């Protein structure tokens, strides 16, 4: 199988994963144009995300992220969804974007720290291990 076919197959697998997660309108993007209107996979339910999809054994994640950043433009969050043979999917994004996303989620625990407002996100102290 050539790399173009492998790429298409990876894009279809990522699209299917999004659909299984409830994002039923996910579809492969327009591949001939490049740029913000042509992510590898588009998902109308996640309008602020630009997906670049990579299905390769040895991924240069920096190059893939650069492509996603360049193609995402200023209004979308660049995300690289990547996998390799016999492996699950990984998602790579910039730390600032991840922190923004996690702050908006229900994964942030309340804290009693008086300086909680100065933290980029709330934290819960980890209990000391038992002897």
Residue ranges and their predicted role:
Residues 1-131:
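Catalytic phosphate/metal-binding cores of nucleic-acid and nucleotide-processing enzymes, i.e., regions
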């Amino acid at each position: 199988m050539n790399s173009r076919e492998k790429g298409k197959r990876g894009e279809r697998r990522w699209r299917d994963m999004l659909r299984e997660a409830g994002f039923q309108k996910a579809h492969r993007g327009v591949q001939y144009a490049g740029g913000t209107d042509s992510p590898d996979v588009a998902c109308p339910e996640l309008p602020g995300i630009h997906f670049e999809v990579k299905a390769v054994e040895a991924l240069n994640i920096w190059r893939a992220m650069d492509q996603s950043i360049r193609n995402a433009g200023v209004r979308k969050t660049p995300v690289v969804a990547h996998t390799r043979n016999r492996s699950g999917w990984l998602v790579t994004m910039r730390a600032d974007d991840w922190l923004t996303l996690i702050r908006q989620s229900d994964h942030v625990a309340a804290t009693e720290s008086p300086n909680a407002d100065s933290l980029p996100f709330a934290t819960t102290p980890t209990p000391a291990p038992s002897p």
